[in-house]
């Protein structure tokens, strides 16, 4: 039994398919590990996974999907490095360990010019109703703080905000609307697959 807080258990049917594809991918005579990332076969794999993600997440047409190397913590530098306009224009809603860790990394990029609201004491989603005055254009939060046991699902309680959400431990486990979401990310190993890739 695998009850690890990190990599999740992989279903036997998936392990069997992986084993088969490692030996001979779709009876092509070569292993899936030997595919060039520029090959048509590999591009078909990526396209198929993207199509399934769009369906799973009810993703609107004006969003795109990125498959990135490494774990979700890499997003702590990837996002600020690629979005310098967030400096002075992002607030953090802190509900636990992972949000605090991300805040520290963001502060390095943004010269500590980040507003943060600690919601860790006596947390409930009703607290969000008192945060309508958050003035910054972007708001960052962690949807499921696994160490503290705090989960946020009703993102609509934060109206008219561009949310950036770490959904590493609960992505694809419930439905949510995209009306006020700009960017979500998740390490694959909790709910989606094996370690080493972030969506």
Residue ranges and their predicted role:
Residues 1-36:
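N-terminal "arm"/small-domain region of PLP-dependent enzymes with the aminotransferase-like
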